[in-house]
Amino acid sequence: MAPRTAPPFRADHVGSLLRPPALLRARADHAAGTITADQLTRAEDEAIRDAVAMQEAAGLRSATDGEFRRAEWHTDFIARLGGIRYAAEWVPVPLFGSDTETTYEAHGTEVTGKVHLAEPIFADHFRFLASTVTTAVPKLTIPSPSMAHFRADLSGSGYAGRDEFRADLAAAYADEITALAALGCRYLQFDDTLFAFLNDPAWRERAAATGIDPEHQHEINVAVVNQALAGRPDGLTVTVHMCRGNYRSAWFSSGGYDFVAEAVFSSLQADGYFLEYDDERSGSFEPLRLVAQDKVVVLGLVTTKTPALESKDDL
């Protein structure tokens, strides 16, 4: 099998890495007011350099910054969009483990006006990553537009309905993609847990209780992502990563990709998919028959939920 010369690569990873102890201490010290923002940035820089060196030493063709500058993988980006801010309320999300059930408190966001790109988001993150890699392609990860509009509170936004809001959101993402490409970004990943979550009947039931159409939300998500990607610059690879969540080895949902497969795998205008397949909760490979022939699928077979390394036979 010939090696791939363009992303996504045959051996790749989704991007987020465990924060090293020194960085966790620096974050705690900054929150306590005992170090400055500049000192925290220097600690992040050092941790990112080490993470990139580790990825390149392992032979990976792409490298990320581990998302080391973020408190949360999604709201750090979403709350920097013009017209969206952090809400006062936190959002409880149920978590499941092998023998436990608990709740994760996520930052809530609210829409306060017309959504737009006030300035490129994570531009500084990408610049530093690009300056740090030596052999790998710098890969930036951002939350999918789905993550911004799924629970969006429009009550104080001035929007008459969700269609106009979604159109503005897609346009803001399109502007972000153009800005990142102008900085030299050639490998971008949308993280979209909702495509996986909506396969879970329990999640669809919770969605219905909030007034969301659980039978068609995934189709709406596909349409918004496609609008955001419609005019992306040549030479930019965009993939979509789908998983069921991982917070301290617990997860948010279960179920194969069957429910969303037809719309997502045949219609989503991304270049490839990163699909979690690390245990029986991920279902079978049967839905992959619907993947368009021009798309690349990267199977997430190596779990990050346990420290045990899978054998080649298991994989």
Each predicted region: which residue ranges?
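Domain-level signal for soluble alpha/beta catalytic cores
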Residues: M1-L315
